[in-house]
Amino acid sequence: MKYELIREIYNKCSGNQMRDVFISNPDTDDPEEYVRDMLKGKLVKIEKEVFPDGTVIIDADVAGLQQRFTFSPD
């Protein structure tokens, strides 16, 4: 399935509330596996939420660095 993916990497610095944002259009049948593959080799804790419209939000704690992956059906 084709998705629009918005990846947000939250800044740990308390004085800087900006975050890095990346947009791509992956083709995957399993968004969680796609994220795990992207973060392979790192210590990762993942929480996943699936919405009725097909949107999948995956919050990942990557060794203390928070990232959010929002997959929206394309």
Where are these regions (language model features)?
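A short, charged, amphipathic alpha-helix used as a generic interaction element across diverse proteins
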Residues: D29-E47
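N-terminal acidic leader/helix
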Residues: K2-E32
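Surface-exposed beta-strand edges and their flanking turn/coil or helix-capping segments
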Residues: M18-D20, R36-L39, F71-P73
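Short, mixed-charge low-complexity intrinsically disordered segments
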Residues: G41-D74
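Generic N-terminal initiation segments characterized by hydrophobic and/or small/turn-forming residues
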Residues: K2-Y3, V35-R36, K40, V62
